Curated annotation (Swiss-Prot):
Sequence ranges assigned to domain 2Fe-2S ferredoxin-type in this UniProt record: 3-93
Record's protein name: Ferredoxin
A GO MF term: 2 iron, 2 sulfur cluster binding
Record bears the keyword Electron transport: yes
GO biological process: electron transport chain; ferredoxin metabolic process
Keywords, ordered alphabetically: 2Fe-2S, Chloroplast, Electron transport, Iron, Iron-sulfur, Metal-binding, Plastid, Transport
Gene Ontology cellular component annotations, sorted alphabetically: chloroplast; chloroplast stroma
First-listed, main subcellular location of the protein, grouped into a coarse class: plastid
Subcellular compartments: Plastid, Chloroplast
Alphabetical list of Gene3D superfamilies matching this protein: 3.10.20.30
Lineage: Eukaryota, Viridiplantae, Streptophyta, Embryophyta, Tracheophyta
Task performed by this protein: Ferredoxins are iron-sulfur proteins that transfer electrons in a wide variety of metabolic reactions.
Superkingdom of the organism of origin: Eukaryota
Amino acid sequence: ATYKVKLVTPDGPIEFDCPDDVYILDQAEEEGHELPYSCRAGSCSSCAGKVTAGTVDQSDGNFLDDDQMADGFVLTCVAYPKSDVTIETHKEEDLTG
């Protein structure tokens, strides 16, 4: 399946289609968008965002704890869309602060 992904960035929202077997960060880059990242392996917080609508599968990541995920935080480098989804990007400071 392919879902609509909306990323709300400091520069404004961007929208694109993302297959459910492609990481959101990877697809964003394919579409020509630059987003923050570091490890690309789900083990840091550089790419952190916050899901405001929809659901993702980020079971490949291991950096976030259950409480952070329950609060909606997501690592876009290891997140697959599981529905149409809206994510606020550039949330590392909210996560670590």
